[in-house]
Design a protein with these regions (language model features):
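Surface-exposed, secretory/extracytoplasmic low-complexity segments enriched in Ser/Thr/Asn/Gly/Pro
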Residues: 1-245, 249
Length: 251
């Protein structure tokens, strides 16, 4: 109620304690009474816990501390906010009136974040140096949330009642977290033209001939994909099972 957990008034109920009721009725008969009040004889089963129970009040207070948490996940030009509406649905109270966070629900929330924001190895639109829009598929570039560690991170922040902006824990990262995760600094390679274009902050600053893999020898360079640059070397010898090739610069 009013955005907080509150303890409801206990209900005395109408479930009889059979043994107490039997004794009360038996006593009334023996005493020649025409009526007996089972309520006055305390024959109804009492609530297990009352509103003023100190342990229950403490659990409710602790649960409300979590509702003040507000965690903003930063995805560059997009944000996802976890607030009291979401958190209230994650808090589960047990039969002993203690509470915990429902890890299955948190896991599902993080899973949905991954479906929405993970880009690792996915297809994406790309505008080439000459203005063509093509679709690049696969590769080893992109962002991928570490689901298990992000669940643990989110649970810890909620339990602490934190208000903060964070990034998920990532398994793979790119250079830009915006919707266009390639950013404005990248290298475009045309295998057909044997040419490379280096873009920095959206401007082409280098255009140079390159030599890609030898197709006839079975060492072709993968095409139509987005790849992270794992290394760059000068005056290097490329060594394979059946070849050695001297290069002045290699990516």
């Amino acid at each position: 109620k009013d955005g907080k957990f509150q303890i409801a008034e206990e209900q005395l109920g109408n479930q009889l304690d059979i043994q107490k009721a039997d004794r009360a009725i038996d006593t009334a008969i023996k005493e020649g009474l025409e009526q007996v009040s089972l309520e006055e004889q305390d024959c109804y089963i009492a609530p297990k816990v009352y509103k003023e129970d100190e342990k229950l009040k403490k659990e409710c207070e602790d649960a409300n501390k979590m509702l003040v948490a507000k965690i903003t996940y930063d995805f560059g030009d997009r944000k996802e906010v976890v607030d009291s509406d979401e958190i209230a649905d994650w808090i589960a109270f047990g039969d002993d009136y203690t509470f915990d966070l429902d890890e299955e629900k948190i896991t599902e929330y993080v899973h949905q974040l991954g479906l929405k924001y993970d880009t690792f190895g996915l297809s994406r639109k790309f505008t080439t140096h000459d203005g063509q829009t093509i679709t690049l598929k696969g590769g080893d570039y992109g962002w991928c949330i570490n689901k298990k560690k992000t669940v643990a991170q989110l649970k810890e922040l909620v339990l602490a009642g934190e208000t903060t902006t964070v990034e998920p824990v990532y398994l793979y990262t790119g250079v830009c977290r915006d919707t266009n995760d390639l950013g404005s600094t990248y290298i475009e390679v045309s295998i057909a033209a044997q040419t490379m274009w280096l873009y920095k902050d959206g401007q082409c600053i280098v255009s140079t001939p390159v030599v890609t893999g030898n197709v006839s020898a079975g060492h072709s360079t993968p095409s139509g994909s987005v790849w992270a640059i794992d290394a760059r070397m000068r005056d290097y010898t490329l060594t394979g099972q059946d070849y050695n090739s001297e290069v002045s610069f290699w990516l």
